[in-house]
Amino acid sequence: MSEVIEMHTGSISKLNDYVAWVRFNNNSYVNLEQAIEMRDKGLELFQGEKYFGLIDTREVFTNASNEALQFLANDDKLSKFCVAQAIVVDNLAVSMVANFYTKYIKNNKEVKTFNDIDKAMKWLETKKTLLN
């Protein structure tokens, strides 16, 4: 794994050549400013190449403002480069936020929630054609 970039709400690192692994600090709250930071750090990490986001919320409680969720779902820059997202959850509260993000915000066509990180990675592997 490559360098780990620390953010206000957690960290992001390259799991491999095309997967950004996003981890959250426990009890973190993502507002618009932090959502922009997450986008910018992901774009910086992959230097203009398309990539997948593996959003790992296991073993933590995290929440986000509606404004942050709307931004992450609808930002043109993020949509252009982060072409699929797998969100891994292991608790009901975070699962509800993830389900809202995946089902009710229009632009999230290639976003899915999982309870198992291996299943999330397998799903991302099926999306490799989006990287072209």
Q: PLM features: residue spans?
A:
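Amphipathic, Lys/Arg-enriched alpha-helical "gate/interface" segment within cytosolic domains
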Residues: 1-132
